Amino acid sequence: MTLTAAIVLAAGEGTRMRSRKPKVLHEFAGKTFLNRVMDAVGALDPETLAVVVRYQAQRVAEAARSYDDAVLIVEQDEIPGTGRAVQCAMEQLGEQGPLSGTVLITASDMPLLDTSTLKQLLDYHRDSGDGATVLTTVLDDPTGYGRIIRDADGNVLKIVEQKDGNSSELAVREVNTSVYVFDAAVLEQAIANLNADNAQGEFYLTDALTVARQVSKVGAFAAPDPLSVEGVNDRVQLASLAKAHNLRVCRQWMLDGVTIVDPQTTWIEDEVEMESDAVILPGCFLQGHTTIAHDAVVGPYTTLIDATVEPEAHVERSRVQESRIGREANIGPWTYLRPGNEIGTGSKAGAFVEMKKAHIGDGSKVPHLSYVGDADLGENTNIGGGTITANYDGVHKNHTHIGSDVHIGAGNLFVAPVNVGDGVTSGAGSVIRHDVPGDAMVYSENTQHVVDNWKPAWER
């Protein structure tokens, strides 16, 4: 079936979120609601993908274009309602020529809407021959949702909104998901006859189904997975849906051979990749394009963002962002790896160590209480506790090079740019301002002064 157009409705404010930003720009498992829905719809390859905006229109439009710069942005005018949003979209789509074929319409506040469900909906619509099809689901508590009212033959009569329903209508548990498929000709007739005769004084898209029924049959397809069409109206619903989704994600990873000790406290975003026999301890957040290899151990209480963890590495109580941790390397506890680090095989970044754009050679160790930024270390080098690479001169970031088989004493300060050759040993408390040749000893003579019988001024 050719999908002529897909219309994503993203014009609403989402007042129940109590937020300064539009509801569709809130995030779910690492992506905005809007981009997640556009992912699902875009995979259907519609001839035109349109996004309707109104509240903070420019901000929402920019987010939509960040997904696909070819997206058609439709700005809804001051007339409220989802029906009016579709009218605006159809007017703009019509400027490209007469519409034929099939039009998909979806809300943008269903972060788990998936391409598979949409394909099944389109197939059902094609096979049924109906002029319009609504995607539905059955809820234990349908409060707040539009109810699907059917006739004796099971055909859809209408959709009744919560504020407009009587007691028998509100007792219905089958609800509208705000996803529809129309034949283009049926949709054009239906939206041309909408009115605002309802409690909200808005143009409801749901009324288009009542109008459509006058010229064609209206069918309904029940989503096989209710979670995939669950909408988010407030932060309570957001947290509930996020937890349910995350537990599913954790369960699937466990079935795939990953050990997750406590799924209740482990959060894994959708684009994370892991190999079997990886171990995730409690309290971990795995985000972005993070990859974790077999036999690596992550946690407890660790955050990985776009990080790569190679086999048999161990990352404990640390935060790692845009960095690669080599095979059998040890990170933590309480290590902060900012973007751009490469930690070599069997290397270590220990307690209270911060690194940024550091390349640590195989077998090298930065055990504790150090800052290593804009620096590279060779192999089998040991950095004493309390060492700092002073990389910033107030204007530029400068580089420090420390070679292989180097032994740096405690409390060293490297004033970049500076190069230290292979096999160097430095004394404790040294300030290294100039290059040091290989196989040398370097130390700073800081004279120690002792004042006998000293008393502070207030005791004299």
Curated annotation (Swiss-Prot):
Its main location: cytoplasm. It catalyses: alpha-D-glucosamine 1-phosphate + acetyl-CoA = N-acetyl-alpha-D-glucosamine 1-phosphate + CoA + H(+); N-acetyl-alpha-D-glucosamine 1-phosphate + UTP + H(+) = UDP-N-acetyl-alpha-D-glucosamine + diphosphate. Binds 1 Mg(2+) ion per subunit. Acetyl-CoA binds at N391, Y392, A428. Pfam families: NTP_transf_3. SUPFAM superfamilies: Nucleotide-diphospho-sugar transferases, Trimeric LpxA-like enzymes. It is an enzyme of class 2 (transferase). Residues 257-460 are annotated as: N-acetyltransferase. It is found in: Cytoplasm. InterPro entries: Bifunctional_GlmU, GlmU-like, GlmU_C_LbH, MobA-like_NTP_Trfase, Nucleotide-diphossugar_trans, Trimer_LpxA-like_sf. UDP-N-acetyl-alpha-D-glucosamine binds at residues 9-12, 23, 76, 81-82, 146, 161, 176, 233, 338, 356, 371, 382. Its EC number is 2.7.7.23, 2.3.1.157. GO terms for biological process: cell morphogenesis; cell wall organization; lipid A biosynthetic process; peptidoglycan biosynthetic process; regulation of cell shape; UDP-N-acetylglucosamine biosynthetic process. PANTHER family: BIFUNCTIONAL PROTEIN GLMU, NUCLEOTIDYL TRANSFERASE. Homotrimer. This is Bifunctional protein GlmU. It comes from Bifidobacterium animalis subsp. lactis (strain AD011).
